[in-house]
Amino acid sequence: NITKNLKFGENLMVTHSVQDMMDTQGSNGVISSALVFDPSIPVYTEDGGYSGSGELGTDMRNPVSIIDRTDKKRTRDRIFGNVYAEWEIIKGLTAKTDFGYDWSQWQEKEYTPVIPEAGRPNSVAELTQQDWQSTRWINTTTLKYDGKWGRHKLMALGGWSFENYSMNFTNMRGSNFASDDESQRFMDCAGTINWILTGRKEWALMSAFTRFDYSYADRYLFSVNFRADGSSKFSKNNRWGYFPSVSGAWRI
């Protein structure tokens, strides 16, 4: 009965995350601004606006205004899972194949409103948006033998794997928004599209591998490994790399 020695398994993970972000690094971040901003200048003006540095060209912003005005979010969706099948052909000899899939889509948006106060003014509202989508799949198939005869033990493993990764991305910036209202903070509402950058990255990897482990009385150990990797990242004239290794040990 072949089904008696068959095993199947799977796992699946689906996630959705939204991260509110804040620029804390660099000379224009909220931490640097809090350290260098003149403490004698009030946070707000008499009419309820934000106080500036009081001096044009200082490239300095009110740290409270940075916190209140920052609208930077990162949204990510991910589907990750794998399925496998394992078959014990005869006692000690097992075949296994595993297929994994990982899909991700994420977006990062940062909206900068009009900043009128002196220090680091911004005369027009801007929206910077980055979108990525990636797909990765991998398949690994192995044949493994475990045997024992008296004080002798042997493990032999052979297999191959295939892996592929691709990512598409679009980066863009828009400006001249009619309103700072949150309902208008989308690229379709921009009066001007300043730039758009699109691209694609892709690579593939194919591998074959084998391993032999031998031990006598669990004291004398010997191992031989060999692996061959063919990658699209390697040069066209040298797509394959070969990696042999031999090791031995004696347990005292």
Show which residues each predicted segment covers.
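Surface-exposed loop/interface segments of Gram-negative outer-membrane beta-barrel transport/assembly proteins
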Residues: 2-80, 96-206, 233-235, 252
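Residue-level signature of outer-membrane beta-barrel architecture
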Residues: 4, 85-87, 145-147, 214-216, ...
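Extended, hydrophobic alpha-helical segments in both membrane/secreted and soluble proteins
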Residues: 97, 139, 207-212, 216, ...
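Glycine-rich, phosphate-binding/catalytic loops in enzymes
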Residues: 114-115, 240-242
